[in-house]
A protein has these predicted regions:
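Catalytic cores of extracellular degradative/oxidative enzymes
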Residues: 1-195, 200-270
Length: 273
C-alpha cells in the first residue's frame, strides 16, 4: 500500500505512518543516473512517476492537519512543499527522460492553480486540496489565512524548482515564486514564528531583482545567523551507542551542514559579490 512512498525517520528514532513522497522522490537518483546511466536507478525513478496516485488513499497530513478540522471537497490533500515539489521532481524527470508531455502538463496545471490562490504559496493552513488526476491544487477555506513552511525549500525542492523554471517559462508562476522568495522571511517571523533561516530564498530574490541590499542580507544571514557560538569540541562515542567508535562534534548536525553548504554553493553562483 505504500509503493512509491518512502519511510520518514526510521534512523535516529522509530518510524511512523508518515510515508512520504519526499523520501523516495526521483530527485535523489536523478544526478547519479545521468552521470552513470545506471539502469536500476532509472527503474527507481520510473517507479515513482505516478506516486501522487497514492494520495487518494494516504493523506500525508492526516495526523498533523486532519481533514475533519480543515475540510475540502478535493479528492486528496498535500502541502506545496515538500509534497507537491517532490511530485513535481518525479514528473519533471519522467518528462525529460521520455518526452511524455502529460507529466509536463500536470506540472503546469499545478503552477497555474497555485498562482491563482489568494496568497499564492502562502495560502491556507499548511495543506491544500489536490486532484491527482489533473495536478490542480485548490483551497476552500478562509481566504485570509496564510502560513509559511520552511520544508518547501529543503529535500530538493529549491533545486528542482530552479531547474524547472528554466524548462517551463510561466510568467504567473515566476511572479508567484519570486513573491514567495521575497516575502518568506518576514511572514515566517510574523505568521508562524519560525526562525529557521532559508537563506537561498533571499538570495534568489536578490539575484532576480538585482537588489544589492537583499544580497548583503543573504550573505550576512549565511555568516552570522547560521553561526553557532558554542565552542568547537570533539567527543568520543563508543560502542554500544554506535556500531563502531567515532569522534563527533555535538553542535554540528547533518541537516545544518548540508543546508548551509547548499546555500553557500548557490549564493556564490547567483550573488557572488
Amino acid at each position: 500500500p505504500f509503493a512509491g512512498l518512502g519511510s520518514r525517520h526510521n534512523v535516529s528514532h522509530w518510524g511512523c505512518g508518515a510515508k512520504e513522497a519526499r523520501i523516495s522522490q526521483a530527485a535523489w537518483n536523478r544526478f547519479y543516473y545521468y552521470l552513470t546511466t545506471d539502469e536500476r536507478s532509472g527503474n527507481l525513478m520510473t517507479e515513482v512517476r505516478d506516486a501522487e496516485q497514492k494520495l487518494y488513499d494516504i493523506d500525508p497530513m492526516r495526523l498533523a492537519l486532519p481533514r475533519e478540522k480543515y475540510p475540502c471537497t478535493a479528492p486528496a490533500r498535500l502541502r506545496v512543499g515538500p509534497d507537491w515539489l517532490a511530485y513535481v521532481g518525479n514528473w519533471m524527470t519522467e518528462w525529460e527522460r521520455t518526452g511524455n508531455t502529460a507529466y509536463r502538463d500536470k506540472i503546469i496545471a499545478g503552477m497555474k492553480s497555485i498562482a491563482a490562490l489568494p496568497h499564492g504559496i502562502f495560502t491556507g493552513p499548511g495543506v491544500l486540496g489536490f486532484d491527482p488526476a489533473t495536478g490542480v491544487l485548490s483551497y476552500e477555506g478562509d481566504p485570509d489565512l496564510q502560513r509559511t513552511e520552511h520544508l518547501i525549500t529543503i529535500m530538493g525542492g529549491f533545486q528542482v524548482m530552479n531547474e524547472l523554471m528554466e524548462m517551463i517559462d510561466l510568467p504567473e508562476w515566476n511572479r508567484t515564486w519570486l513573491t514567495f522568495a521575497r516575502e518568506y522571511k518576514e511572514k515566517a517571523r510574523t505568521i508562524t514564528h519560525n526562525p529557521f533561516p532559508v537563506t537561498r530564498l533571499t538570495a534568489y530574490a536578490a539575484a532576480k531583482t538585482g537588489n544589492r541590499e537583499l544580497a548583503a542580507e543573504a550573505w550576512d544571514e549565511l555568516w552570522h545567523v547560521w553561526h553557532n557560538d558554542k565552542p568547537f569540541t570533539v567527543r568520543r562515542v563508543e560502542v554500544p551507542e554506535v556500531p563502531a567508535p567515532v569522534d563527533e562534534n555535538p553542535v554540528v548536525c547533518t541537516n545544518d551542514a548540508a543546508t548551509w553548504s547548499l546555500a553557500a554553493i548557490y549564493m556564490q553562483e547567483v550573488i557572488p559579490e
